[in-house]
Amino acid sequence: MISFRNDYSEGAHPQVLAALEKNNLVTTCGYSMDDFCAEARGIVRARFSCPQADVHFMVGGTIANTTVIAAALRPWEGVIAADTGHINVHETGAIEASGHKVCAIETPDGKLTPALVREVMRRHCDGQDEHMVLPRMVYISDATELGTIYTKAELAALHEVCGEYGLYLFLDGARMAAALVAEGNDLQPEDFATYCDVFYLGGTKNGLLFGEAVVITNEALKPHFRNMIKQRGGMFAKGFLFGTQFTAYLQDELWLTMAPVSYTHLRAHETSQDL
């Protein structure tokens, strides 16, 4: 039986498991400061054409989202998201629990547009009313929770409107690989680094046992990010497991080879909900 309930019902790709077995008894230092993670960071930077980016590894999507948002926002600031966005629907109020409001807005397809961002800013008096939450970040997913994808023009337009209002653009890439191989996609990996202040490449939903690679391109978001990881409970002691997996994941484009399967399952699940 094939289950479409989620895209992490099985373990890991055999090549990933083989890499883990090979390095299983290698003695390393902890907390992702080892040579395996250093190698993986270099591969991530090269693949996304962002040599100056900071790369951090997190166990899963929710801890990645909460850590990035908490690190980027001041106490009175909030994050704009589609009403179907993962941080608004499926994270048990994790963002609000950290003290930041999710400024959700209804969308027809799970995607945000410049017009929707402007509407949220209008509702919040363009950030000029001290009695209201000040939106400071835009959160999007690619692929979205509805299985839709962004085009390069759409991502560039969001980047532009974020610059207009002084907003950070944060892309949840839990299903990034699926988006990149989807029919109609015209984005390349380097486009995420070009247009986003911070994004992450997901592995949990695409053949890794666990792991997301957070990529920070905006210099303002880089300082003390590891402090925030630790404070939020995301500092993984056996960090070499991230490095080993992501190196296997990105070498020979394994991440894109596996992606058509996960994208097909995602679309099948979403279609079944409409029956």
Positions of PLM-derived features:
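Conserved small/polar residues in nucleotide/adenosyl-binding loops
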Residues: 264-271
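PLP-dependent aminotransferase-class I/II
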Residues: 99-145, 150-157
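Conserved PLP-anchoring active-site segment centered on the Schiff-base-forming lysine
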Residues: 71-89, 118
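Conserved core segment of the aminotransferase class I/II
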Residues: 212-236, 247-253
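Catalytic PLP-binding core of fold-type I/II PLP enzymes
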Residues: 150-182
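Active-site PLP attachment segment
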Residues: 95, 175, 193-222
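Conserved N-terminal alpha-helix of the aminotransferase class I/II PLP-enzyme fold
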Residues: 13-60, 83-88, 94
